[in-house]
């Protein structure tokens, strides 16, 4: 039931926010200001106020237990403040970056990274779901991907564009059963390819990383899909596909978007793809 779900969420939150900065420290050396820093870091990363409160609640219950069990005289997690002003991330690929980005993805020598990044972009799914994509969730004939459990605990059905189906067909030949992106770790599937994504962005001349000004992270691809659909009524699949046609058609679509920088760079991108 839900208990199991929240336990798993707590584990994930512990790993994501507490283990890295504090995992190697002795309990008795952890101070209130360290925990405050954990919360403000999460806010700076653009985590929602709800998520930051959940991290605070988790820290609070962990240290209360440590006091109950006699490991600590008092909890450093009492009265931790949440500012309530998370920096909302609204980074997505800009018109003038899109063509450079496609070009850089196509030039990526690691096929797995290339396919994963393109699928993240074309499906708008969460990176954790793309990494853990399983063949049994995918119906290529119907062009559908049924995710059993997403971050919010709900199942989700994603329509796969012809481009996404094409990428998956090519992968299917290599990894017919199990995970679409097998990995060597405990989970059996790939972990988020941070280095590979950074490589692609570097190649495209786009800043990367949460701590870099205007830097992109893999999760921003999810936002990119929504922003472009909202802005143009054209799906990214169509925009991406336009790069696959000789430049006349591609330029026509970009012209419809009425975005000058894209029109200039689209020819370079199309040239790179052929």
Show which residues each predicted segment covers:
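C-terminal flanking helix
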Residues: 60-63, 67, 258-262
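Short, polar N-cap/turn motifs at the start of nucleic acid-interacting alpha helices
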Residues: 74, 136-144, 234-253, 264
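Short, aromatic/basic-rich helix-turn unit that serves as a nucleic-acid recognition element
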Residues: 1-15
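Proline-centered turn/helix-capping motifs that create local helix->coil transitions or kinks
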Residues: 67-75, 205-208, 274
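Basic, Lys/Arg- and aromatic-enriched nucleic-acid-binding interface segment
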Residues: 45-58, 68-133, 141, 147, ...
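Catalytic-site neighborhood detector that most strongly recognizes the C-terminal catalytic loop/helix
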Residues: 92, 149-153, 163-165, 243-268
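Short, basic (Lys/Arg/His-rich) helix/loop patches that form interaction surfaces
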Residues: 45, 49, 99, 103-114, ...
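Short, conserved phosphate-binding/catalytic loop or strand-edge motifs used
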Residues: 28-41, 78-83
